[in-house]
Each structure stands twice: as structure tokens, then as C-alpha cells.
Amino acid sequence: MGENTGNQNAKQLAEAWKQTAEHLRKRYNSFGGKILSRKDWGLAQIHDTLLVRAVAKQDWIDYVLPKLDLDKMTDESTGLPFTDKSIQKALSQVYDNISTEGMATFKPGTNSYGKTFANRRTDHRFLAFKNADAWMEYQTRFGNPDPFVTMMEHINGMSRD
């Protein structure tokens, strides 16, 4: 997540991961994808649908919102920074998509829950956490806190897509 731990091995691993993730992004795009590069992107999020479903939508929003760096996020409907109202609406949609495994936006007769191939993986870069601790806290509560598992699942998913 761009934070210096002082551990040279961790720094080398982070650089190798950054190169791998960038290679996967470019490869995906070469086959018709449309994932934009984010200099601040570190790791994907793994969302455990059952853990997310177990809490009320507003409770999930109240938990995740203080962990996000809104300066790194853009309201896709306006292209502008989020307002208090628009971030609530966006996170409500994120909750719906996670808790329904994408079925909230599914349109009959389409594939990938209404998303074109090009846009299929753009959602995975929407949440921008303030730092590694905020990411880890979210993953511990609603995903998988093991960064290695997250990396391997990201590689697997990107390779299959």
C-alpha cells in the first residue's frame, strides 16, 4: 500500500507484486478489458458475501466509510469528488453488489451481471483504503486478511478472465 516498513524483503515482495499486477492489468486490457492504472492501487479486496450479508447495509457503510481515502476516489456518475450524500449512495450500491454477488445489477439476457467484458473488473478498484491497516481491518471483518491469499486469488481471477 506504499508504506515503508523498513523491511527490505517486504519492499522487494511489494515491488514484485506491483509488477505482476500491472502485467495482469495490461494483459487483461490487451484482450479488450478497460482497467485503468492506479498508482495508489496495492491489493484487491476479497469480500465474503456471507459476512457482508450478516450486517445491515448502513452498519457496513458506517464501518467502511472511515477507512476509505475519499481523495483517491471519484464519483463515477459526475467525475467529481464525492459529497456526503453521493458517497452514501455509492457505498449502498457497493453493498448491494457484494451482498448479492452481483445479482443486484444483473440484467436478463446479458452475461457478467450486465457488465461488458471491458468493464467487468473495474468495480474491484473502487474502494481506496487510507492505508494498509485500514485495508487489513476491512479484510479481517469482511474478507480474507491474508495478503498472500488475496494475491493468489487476484492472479487466478485475472488469468481466467
Roles of regions detected by a PLM:
Residues 1-161:
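Structural preference for well-ordered, secondary-structure-rich domains
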